[in-house]
């Protein structure tokens, strides 16, 4: 009998899909991710179901669409009634450990207004055992730095300023003050190795989170100079940001509102004013941060190999969301463009190698990760999960009833650091959009703003809105109906498979039935 399976769920932050060498990013060096891709299956059409971090991680770990979990923005609470991956793992005998963060604001009905968790961007999701948390306020990391003998500056975040400088005007080619040996990526790796070494052969589940390549976009030596800006792909954008802004009121708001200071510690000015040379340098730094994470993963992978646990460990690599990186003159993860939503997903399952090295083109979403892990460990996803297990796709091509489009959402209500709701004159519950997209067309529906429609064959980068073009009227109607049907099929369904009968309670779907609506 084979030993119980281990699971390593690696969740990086803000790593977009087209920065994966196995998918064509040949300008990058990621030997450890490359190994994972060779031994597992890489999903080419994978998206997060929402952005930014908190909502995205809520979907990843609950298996629910934004429309169902309703933790719609960073700082918006997650209803305590929802189960999640960690709670489900406990039901089948695992003690789920977490390194990193989940950016979860707790249900205020379970605490009180003075709870310190309500003063931070987010805390840990219930059910996980923290063995190296970043939150709250990165205290775990800064405490580790101090324990290593590093003299923290009065403003702790100043460790991400360039060496010898008190501020940075924007993009920089300088290394940050902190060394690679003391970076946050190293901190998470050390926590992971400490946890793994203490398991003593017992089965484990570890959520291993990394903060990078999330901003600030500054890397420690030698990663700051590992890539030449001239080797980076050019940004995809109109000749000027004003042309982009004409596409939609929400895009116009972000082009005017997003500041460089959110991406370069101490910088000023609008992100949309970055010239092409600056974007190339920013991308080179971003690539360096990616390689730093990959080198750290190499240490974890080496330990698994040397201790005989590599072959018995399911490894899933993914990101919470993407990053615009100057495409469409934007920085961050906002709006509706692919760059914010398309993310990596690589799955290597212990004992499954029939499709090792394959690139799977089926449409997959972050809500699929939870059902995949639970099924791999002999459990089952909750009835209300919006995702489907990916295990069949590890053995053969997608089944005939697999989804035929991607679905993702974004809520842009005001939070303390961004106020689109106020700027656009909307109520908070009007600040919502959803997207349905296949290989041919992309439809963006807004609760209270004009829709968008793109012909992806003719306009893959989505510059021309065809929603009002009479030639496309029938297509717009078709995809609007697809969006409505998708939402109706995935309405909350925790108890809808039960019914009372004269003979008593009847369950219409067996608990282990894996069928899910597309």
Language-model segments: which ranges?
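A contiguous, mid-protein "functional segment" used to position or interact
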Residues: 470-497
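Intrinsically disordered, low-complexity polar regions and short flexible loop motifs
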Residues: 459
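Charged/polar positions within long, soluble alpha-helices
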Residues: 302, 448, 488-492
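Formylglycine-dependent sulfatase
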Residues: 1-444, 451, 462-478, 508-518
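Short, charged, surface-exposed hinge/linker loops at domain edges
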Residues: 492-509
């Amino acid at each position: 009998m084979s030993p119980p399976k281990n699971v390593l769920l690696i969740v990086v932050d803000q790593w977009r899909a087209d920065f994966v060498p196995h998918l064509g990013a040949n300008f990058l060096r990621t030997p450890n991710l490359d190994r994972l891709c060779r031994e597992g299956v890489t999903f080419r059409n994978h998206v997060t179901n929402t952005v930014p971090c908190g909502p995205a991680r809520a979907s990843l770990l609950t298996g629910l669409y934004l429309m169902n979990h309703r933790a719609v923005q960073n700082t918006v609470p997650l209803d305590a009634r929802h189960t999640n991956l960690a709670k489900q793992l406990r039901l089948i005998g695992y003690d789920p450990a977490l390194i990193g963060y989940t950016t979860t604001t707790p249900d205020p009905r379970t605490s009180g207004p003075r709870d310190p968790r309500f003063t931070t961007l987010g805390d840990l999701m219930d059910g996980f055992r923290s063995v190296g948390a970043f939150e709250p306020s990165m205290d775990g990391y800064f405490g580790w730095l101090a324990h290593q003998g590093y003299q923290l500056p009065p403003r702790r975040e100043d460790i991400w300023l360039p060496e010898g400088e008190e501020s940075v005007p924007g993009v920089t080619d300088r290394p940050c003050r902190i060394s690679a040996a003391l970076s946050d990526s190293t901190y998470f790796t050390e926590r992971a190795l400490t946890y793994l070494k203490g398991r003593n052969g017992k089965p484990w589940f570890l959520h291993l989170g990394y903060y990078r390549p999330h901003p600030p976009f500054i890397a420690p030596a030698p990663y700051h100079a590992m890539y030449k800006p001239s080797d980076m792909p050019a940004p995809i954008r109109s000749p000027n940001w004003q042309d982009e802004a004409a596409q939609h009121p929400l895009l116009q708001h972000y082009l005017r509102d997003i500041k460089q200071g959110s991406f370069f510690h101490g910088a000023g000015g609008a992100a949309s004013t970055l010239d092409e040379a600056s974007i190339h340098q920013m991308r080179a730094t971003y690539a360096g941060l990616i390689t730093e994470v990959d080198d750290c993963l190499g240490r974890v992978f080496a330990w698994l190999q040397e201790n005989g646990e590599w072959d018995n460990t399911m490894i899933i690599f993914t990101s919470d969301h993407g990053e615009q990186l100057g495409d469409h003159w934007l920085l961050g993860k906002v709006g509706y463009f692919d760059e914010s939503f398309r993310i990596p997903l690589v799955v290597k399952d212990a004992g499954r190698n029939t499709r090792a090295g394959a690139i799977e083109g089926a449409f997959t979403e972050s809500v699929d990760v939870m059902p995949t892990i639970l099924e791999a460990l002999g459990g089952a996803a909750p009835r209300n999960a919006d995702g489907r297990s990916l295990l069949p796709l590890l053995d053969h091509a997608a089944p005939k009833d697999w989804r035929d489009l991607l679905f993702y959402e974004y809520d842009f209500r005001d939070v303390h650091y961004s106020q689109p709701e106020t700027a656009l004159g909307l109520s908070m519950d009007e600040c919502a959009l959803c997207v349905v997209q296949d290989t041919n067309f992309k439809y963006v529906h807004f609760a209270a703003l004009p829709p968008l429609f793109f012909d992806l064959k003719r306009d893959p980068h989505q510059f021309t809105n065809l929603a009002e073009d009479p030639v496309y009227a029938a297509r717009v109607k078709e995809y609007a109906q697809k969006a409505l049907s998708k939402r109706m099929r995935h309405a909350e369904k925790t108890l809808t498979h039960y019914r009372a009968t004269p003979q008593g309670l009847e369950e219409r779907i067996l608990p282990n039935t894996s069928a899910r609506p597309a």
